[in-house]
Curated annotation (Swiss-Prot):
<keyword id="KW-1133">Transmembrane helix</keyword>
<dbReference type="InterPro" id="IPR002797">
    <property type="entry name" value="Polysacc_synth"/>
</dbReference>
<feature type="transmembrane region" description="Helical">
    <location>
        <begin position="446"/>
        <end position="466"/>
    </location>
</feature>
<feature type="transmembrane region" description="Helical">
    <location>
        <begin position="91"/>
        <end position="111"/>
    </location>
</feature>
<feature type="transmembrane region" description="Helical">
    <location>
        <begin position="281"/>
        <end position="301"/>
    </location>
</feature>
<keyword id="KW-0749">Sporulation</keyword>
<dbReference type="Pfam" id="PF01943">
    <property type="entry name" value="Polysacc_synt"/>
</dbReference>
<protein>
    <recommendedName>
        <fullName>Stage V sporulation protein B</fullName>
    </recommendedName>
</protein>
<comment type="function">
    <text>Involved, directly or indirectly, in spore cortex biosynthesis. Affects only indirectly the expression of late sporulation genes.</text>
</comment>
<keyword id="KW-0472">Membrane</keyword>
<feature type="transmembrane region" description="Helical">
    <location>
        <begin position="120"/>
        <end position="140"/>
    </location>
</feature>
<feature type="transmembrane region" description="Helical">
    <location>
        <begin position="250"/>
        <end position="270"/>
    </location>
</feature>
<feature type="transmembrane region" description="Helical">
    <location>
        <begin position="165"/>
        <end position="185"/>
    </location>
</feature>
<feature type="transmembrane region" description="Helical">
    <location>
        <begin position="6"/>
        <end position="26"/>
    </location>
</feature>
<comment type="similarity">
    <text>Belongs to the polysaccharide synthase family.</text>
</comment>
<keyword id="KW-1003">Cell membrane</keyword>
<keyword id="KW-0812">Transmembrane</keyword>
Length: 518
């Protein structure tokens, strides 16, 4: 099975992540165009419940599988790899059988009582079949990740989004005549189809690239898998706890926001619309660049686990430094584009600039958010998943408490929820960094970081001037594309001028690297 280096694997995932995020963004835009702000609100209010259910079913196993498979591969232990897969499939299979019927049974209660809008029942029911699908695909993803073969992961992500986009317009159009809630359910069904296509692709890749036979002595592997089960649980339990806390917080978020806005005197329909603008429009744009940090997180777990298994601490520290540097540089241009062109992005993408104010307030804080995923991946690889879980718990409690405190104030309303969300994100990132620094030295080069922030500010001012004085075409979409391209070029030039990135580093970027140097 082809194994990539840390950098190559990361670049493959970043390329796939860029494509899938763009496709996913198109998917969100299509949904917004077909079912409107109210429909997006119903869709987004049901989504946290879906992620909570899948988190419980996955049980944190993708990270655990990745870590343990990487360690087993470093030792050349193929039998251990088989035991890991057998136990993981058994665990996720049992959990799927438990949580799928429970999800169906409690969906009406969640819709009417907790989410305060009974129309969310239909999107909740539509996503139920995805639970066992994601449970199985997560095991295969963890396996390929642990083998440091990122190609199947990358292709499956792209395939999932292609299928979603291909079906979302059809599904929403078919169900829209029956009501906005049915259209939201149709959008959810397209997501289920995408996940199924992704699973089938991963299964085919595994079947033709595997070096072990899973079905042979399957039951015997389960009986003799006590040690493997314990090792999986030592990583998966705190990882599940961390994700469960995050998803539970997200699950309660629309509930707390709805109740808080009700106290502030906002009607139910208006609250649903405002929450749709914040989470469906603004948060979608703000989290768009996180595909880079997600790719880093995916590649970091096996790379650091392998380094620790082989006791190569210098390699581990170097990987961490690489990851933090890439987070800062990629996050910087993302913040500039989101902050400066917030109104234009919203109008071009959604036909309304109502949520632009959220982006302008939240974008600067999201620079720290882009560090959160890689830092958590490092903690998990260092057997500090429990510490990551506690950090997530603290952040979730602070966020939820602040939502109630701030969103109940009529002067703030939904903006109070936005401020609470970024406060929780920043807090968790800082706690993760503090925890990692106790085990591994995080070399903070003050001059380099100061120059990086200076480049971000300078690029922001230049981008604002470009928007004000330069026109690239008659339509706003053409102007926006020109402004973003110019801003990215200026940012790259500033990085080279201040020597924050070197020419030989640019050459390593596939295809575009050599074009930039020329």
């Amino acid at each position: 099975m082809a194994k990539q280096t840390f950098l190559k694997g990361t670049l493959i995932l970043i390329a796939a992540g860029m494509v899938t995020r763009m496709l996913g963004f198109v998917n969100r835009v299509v949904i917004a165009r077909f079912i409107g702000e109210e429909g997006v609100g119903l869709y987004m209010m049901a989504a946290p419940t879906f992620f909570l259910a899948t988190t419980l079913t996955q049980f944190g196993l993708p990270v655990a599988i990745s870590k343990l498979v990487a360690e087993a591969s470093a030792r050349g232990d193929h039998q251990k790899t088989k035991n890991i897969l057998v136990m993981s499939l058994t665990i996720t299979g049992v959990l799927s059988l438990i949580f799928t019927p429970l999800f169906l049974f409690f969906a009406p209660v969640m819709a009417e009582t907790m989410l305060t809008d009974k129309r969310t029942l239909y999107p909740l029911l539509a996503i139920t079949p995805v639970v066992p699908i994601i449970a199985i695909s997560s095991v295969l993803r963890g396996y390929f990740q642990g083998k440091q073969n990122m190609n199947p992961l990358a292709m499956s992500q792209v395939l999932e989004q292609v299928v979603r986009i291909s079906l979302v317009a059809v599904c929403t159009t078919i169900f829209l005549p029956y009501g906005i809630e049915y259209a939201a359910a149709g959008a959810m069904l397209s997501s289920v189809a995408g996940e199924l296509a992704s699973l089938l692709y991963l299964f085919v890749c595994f079947k033709y690239k595997k070096t072990i036979k899973i079905r042979k002595h399957f039951l015997q592997s389960i009986k003799n898998g006590k040690q493997t089960f314990t090792q999986l649980m030592s990583v998966s339990l705190p990882t599940t706890g961390s994700r469960f806390i995050g998803n539970l917080s997200w699950f309660f978020e629309p509930i707390v926001v709805a109740q808080s806005l009700a106290i502030a005197g906002v009607a139910t329909v208006a609250a649903t619309k405002q929450y749709g603008e914040l989470t469906g429009f603004a948060m979608t744009l703000l989290t768009l660049p996180s595909f880079i940090t997600y790719s880093l997180s995916t590649a970091l777990v096996p790379a650091i686990s392998e380094g620790m298994e082989q006791k190569k601490l210098q390699v581990v520290e170097y990987r961490l430094e690489q990851a933090m540097r890439l987070c800062l540089l990629s996050g910087g241009i993302s913040v500039v584009i989101l902050f400066v062109f917030a109104d234009e992005l919203m109008r071009v993408m959604y036909g309304s600039s109502g949520a632009a104010v959220f982006i302008k307030v939240m974008a600067p804080f999201f620079l720290l958010y882009y560090f959160q995923g890689p830092l958590q991946a490092v903690l998990q690889a260092l057997n500090l998943a429990g510490a990551a879980m506690m950090n997530s718990l603290i952040g979730a409690l602070v966020k939820t408490g602040l939502i109630f405190v701030l969103a109940t104030r009529p002067s703030l309303g939904i903006m109070g929820a936005a401020l609470a969300i970024v406060t929780g994100m920043v807090l968790v990132t800082l706690l993760h960094a503090a925890t990692v620094s106790k085990v591994l030295p995080i070399s903070i080069k003050i001059k380099e970081y100061a120059l990086s922030f200076a480049v971000i500010v300078i690029c922001g001012f230049i981008s604002s001037a470009i928007k004000q004085y330069i026109s690239f075409g008659a339509s706003e979409a053409v102007n926006l594309a020109g402004w973003i391209a110019a801003s990215a070029a200026i940012y790259m030039i500033l990085l080279l001028v201040f020597r924050l990135i070197k020419k030989d580093e640019l050459r390593r970027i596939p295809i575009i690297g050599r074009l930039i140097i020329r």
